[in-house]
């Protein structure tokens, strides 16, 4: 690594679309710049723009800034709008607000304008305030202040990349980690009636994730209070969020599902709805352990980009918003470290470095397979590369089908299906009878063992299990379920709208020989059935999981879940086992 010069407390005042009243607004941005000491007008380097995840700040990317500056990049790390110490309200990575603001930073990195800073460290010598003009980046078009530039960041810092690239063609490549495709699905999923990707039909709204939405608003409001001195107006009206966000939260809290007004916001801030404007090579990285932005979101973005001929690769890493694998709250050992001298010693760190070197420096290095995924059952030492399997594209493997039979069995042949029925009901009044997780806390903080054990209350769910497996089954991808529900009571209420429609939560358990059960990464699949008289196709969460020999795979259809807004009315429901038209569970399996 080469020596790095730093400029901290860079201050920008940039245009950022319109405020809640439709008036043009400017916002302040706080940033730090990391520069290779040798970079200059005669030794120009590519640029990287990065920002924080939700509730974070520029400081979160300091390690990345130092690491990549030491490898020949100028890195600008900034605090996103609405977070301390940048101004304006949180607008959820809106291309017309956050994307416009980021575009001004692209201009700065292309030599357009200057920015004051509070301190510097150049060649190991600390300095006081000054003004910085960038004259050390590679320019693709000097007249348009167009630097050779890539973006990287996770979660909220992932979506901003799409928002910026959609507004600014000067961005050359993206590396978004653990971010969303469609926020309507992320915050209120419905895993049936999917029109495309994870985007469900407006007429088939999802079910609110009460844990995640509550956590986000709490964090955002707290950030507004902490940053009040920077921009007191951010706490006026809807506290530290654009007005539409408060309105959407009120709708979700009241109804438990989104409406057309909610969609106007979520569609505007989701790449699913403007992906035709994203045309640059993209390296998607998504987390296997993530109940906020699950693997289906990355698949939706991957497929949309690939269908339009945009170069795209996808990796599924071990960790996400819900923690890591085993005792790790973050990346597995040797998987990802972007903070120092050991980038090349981690599987994804090396791939990201090579990606930028190839896309921004033109280096003839491998950018890796189009699809790769972490397998937590593979032992290794050092780099996590041995734990990653790869493929030339997604999906992978073949599908195996089990049919729902009587006696709560899953069988592999239609002929083996025995007639019967399984019935259950929710408690009503919105009360949960099943538990999957404490959203946002599990995997991040230590919780009592009993608190983290998923459960389903007898009489409120249906379950079907395979016999003990004779050999391991490796599941990679999204299982699906085709099923017909029978609920005369709901058939009478569903015409009244979403509140009268059947709610079901589908999930897969790994059942050990001793009867203990594992809900893989606490992932479940909420479904709101628009018409209970018609067959339903359900997409369960994508997983990467080995079901060991001697274990059983169990499908559960629950009436409620404590992490979601549940039905108020009592909804008795039955699934009939029929040899002529059995419900079918399809599992993607790799050798």
Regions found by a protein language model. Give the residues of each.
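N-terminal cap/lid segment of alpha/beta-hydrolase-fold proteins
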Residues: 1-43, 469-471
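Cap/lid segment of the alpha/beta-hydrolase catalytic domain
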Residues: 40-140, 146-147, 326-338, 501-503, ...
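Accessory cap/linker subdomain of secreted extracellular hydrolases
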Residues: 70, 85, 99-102, 108-144, ...
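Short beta-strand/loop motif that positions the catalytic acidic residue
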Residues: 278, 284-286, 290
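Acidic beta-to-alpha connecting loop that harbors the catalytic carboxylate
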Residues: 288-290, 319, 560
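Conserved alpha/beta-hydrolase "acid-adjacent" motif
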Residues: 291-297
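Catalytic histidine neighborhood in serine/cysteine hydrolases
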Residues: 305-331
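C-terminal, loop-rich substrate-recognition/catalytic regions characterized by aromatic stacking residues
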Residues: 332-333, 337-591
């Amino acid at each position: 690594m080469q020596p790095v010069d730093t400029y901290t407390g860079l201050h920008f005042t940039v245009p950022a679309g319109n405020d809640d009243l439709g008036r043009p607004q400017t916002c302040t941005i706080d940033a730090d710049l990391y520069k290779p000491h040798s970079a200059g007008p005669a030794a120009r380097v590519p640029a990287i723009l990065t920002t924080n995840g939700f509730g974070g700040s520029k400081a979160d990317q300091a390690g990345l800034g130092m690491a990549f500056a030491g490898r020949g990049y100028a890195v600008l790390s900034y605090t996103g709008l609405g977070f301390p110490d940048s101004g304006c309200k949180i607008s959820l990575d809106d291309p017309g607000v956050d994307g416009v603001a980021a575009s001004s930073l692209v201009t700065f990195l292309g030599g357009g304008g200057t920015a004051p800073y509070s301190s510097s460290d150049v060649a190991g010598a600390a300095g006081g305030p000054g003004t910085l003009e960038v004259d050390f980046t590679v320019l693709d078009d000097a007249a348009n202040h167009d630097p050779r530039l890539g973006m990287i960041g996770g979660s909220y810092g992932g979506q901003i990349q799409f928002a910026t690239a959609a507004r600014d063609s000067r961005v050359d490549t993206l590396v978004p980690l653990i971010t969303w495709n469609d926020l309507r699905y992320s915050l209120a999923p419905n895993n049936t009636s999917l029109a495309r990707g994870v985007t469900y039909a407006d007429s088939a709204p999802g079910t609110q994730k009460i844990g995640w939405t509550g956590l986000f608003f709490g964090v955002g409001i707290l950030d507004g209070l902490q940053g009040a001195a920077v921009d007191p107006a951010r706490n006026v009206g809807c506290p530290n969020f654009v007005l539409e966000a408060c309105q959407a939260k009120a709708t979700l809290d009241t109804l438990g599902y989104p409406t057309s007004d909610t969609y106007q916001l979520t569609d505007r801030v989701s790449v699913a709805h403007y992906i035709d404007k994203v045309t640059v090579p993209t390296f998607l990285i998504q987390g296997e352990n993530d109940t906020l932005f699950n693997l289906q979101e990355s698949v939706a973005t991957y497929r949309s980009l690939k269908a339009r001929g945009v170069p795209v690769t996808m990796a599924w890493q071990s960790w996400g918003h819900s923690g890591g694998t085993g005792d790790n709250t973050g990346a597995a050992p040797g998987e990802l470290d972007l903070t120092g001298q050991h980038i090349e010693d981690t599987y994804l760190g090396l791939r990201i470095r090579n990606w930028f070197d190839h896309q921004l420096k033109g280096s003839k290095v491998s950018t890796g397979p189009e699809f790769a995924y972490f397998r937590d059952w593979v032992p290794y030492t050092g780099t996590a590369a041995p734990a990653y399997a790869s493929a030339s594209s997604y999906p992978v493997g073949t599908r195996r089908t089990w049919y729902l039979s009587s006696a709560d069995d899953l069988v592999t042949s239609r002929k083996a299906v025995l007639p019967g029925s399984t019935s259950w009901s929710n408690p009503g009044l919105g009360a949960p009878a099943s538990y999957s997780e404490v959203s946002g806390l599990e995997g991040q903080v230590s919780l009592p063992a009993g608190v983290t054990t998923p459960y389903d209350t007898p009489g409120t769910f249906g379950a079907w299990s395979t016999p003990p497996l004779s050999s391991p089954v490796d599941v990679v991808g999204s299982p699906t379920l085709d099923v017909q529900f029978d609920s005369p009571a709901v058939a009478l209420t569903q015409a009244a709208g979403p509140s009268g429609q059947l709610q079901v939560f589908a999930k897969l358990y790994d059942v050990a020989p001793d009867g203990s059960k594992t809900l893989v990464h606490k992932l479940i699949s909420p479904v709101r059935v628009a018409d209970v008289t018609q067959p339903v196709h359900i997409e369960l969460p994508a997983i990467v999981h080995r079901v060991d020999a001697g274990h059983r795979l169990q499908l559960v259809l629950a009436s409620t879940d404590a992490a979601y807004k549940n039905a108020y009315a009592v909804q008795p429901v039955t699934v009939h086992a029929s040899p002529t038209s059995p419900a079918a569970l399809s599992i993607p399996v790799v050798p």
